[in-house]
Design a protein with these regions (language model features):
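Residues in soluble alpha-helical coiled-coils and helical-bundle/repeat scaffolds
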Residues: 50-54, 58, 76-80, 97, ...
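Hydrophobic alpha-helical connector segments
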Residues: 58, 69-102, 154-158, 182, ...
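Amphipathic alpha-helical packing segments from all-alpha helical-bundle domains
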Residues: 68, 98-106, 116-142, 153-156, ...
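Helix-loop "lid/cap" segments that line or gate small-molecule binding pockets
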Residues: 74, 90-96, 104-114, 187-191
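C-terminal peripheral helix-coil segments that are non-catalytic and often amphipathic
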Residues: 86-87, 91, 130-139, 160-161, ...
Length: 203
């Protein structure tokens, strides 16, 4: 008996949508584009998500729900709180590694800022990111990787520098975005580094 083909999961479809969103603006994106990327029939997208708006909203919600998990994975991978923060900041630039994908990202951001339902999800995402960043900074201070400081204020600055660095890079276009972001975050954190820096045992 021929085995039944494995059904494409919602998560796989949303991952396909995210890839298409890097290449195509919200005006030009179609459910057929996403279906082709996911290897499913367009009717499957309609059955699962309905309209293009609902698909984009589901993608936004899925990304937001995964923020804390992404930080946890980075902590397990890098151990050091300070290294975790820097490397995670760099890894988060992968969705917009070209000026064109950055432009598309900004186009989707307009929806996030003008549609109340999207904005509520975006705000939750940013609040979680800031809370997780503060947690890493608190651990970095405890591990003596950073000097004692106002970690809430510094977390806000880290978030702002991350966002600003990506837009700045899209204008100047010098080198890869990952390297540009790394330099920006490290420059922000440099004055806070402890003179007694040691390899952290924090986990």
């Amino acid at each position: 008996m021929t085995p039944r083909p494995r059904e494409t999961s919602d998560a796989e479809i949303l991952a396909a949508a995210a890839r298409v969103m890097q290449r195509v603006s919200p005006v030009d994106l179609t459910l057929a584009d996403v279906a082709e990327e996911a290897g499913v029939h367009p009717a499957t997208i309609i059955q699962r998500f309905g309209t293009k708006r609902e698909l984009l909203l589901a993608n936004c919600k899925a990304w937001t729900a995964d923020v804390a998990g992404q930080f946890a994975e980075a902590r397990a991978k890098y151990r050091s709180p300070l290294k975790t923060l820097i490397e995670h900041s760099v890894e988060c630039t992968g969705f917009a590694s070209t000026p064109e994908s950055m432009a598309n990202s900004l186009a989707y951001l307009q929806i996030d800022l003008t549609d109340p339902e999207f904005h509520a999800v975006l705000l939750a995402q940013y609040m979680t990111m800031r809370a997780e960043t503060k947690k890493l900074l608190d651990h970095a201070v405890a591990a003596r990787e950073l000097k004692p400081c106002d970690t809430a204020a510094l977390a806000r600055l880290v978030q702002q520098v991350n966002a600003g660095a990506m837009l700045d890079w899209a204008v100047y276009r010098k080198g890869p975005l990952a390297a540009w972001t790394r330099r920006s975050v490290e420059a922000l954190l440099a004055p806070y580094r402890s003179g007694r820096y040691r390899k952290s045992r924090w986990a």
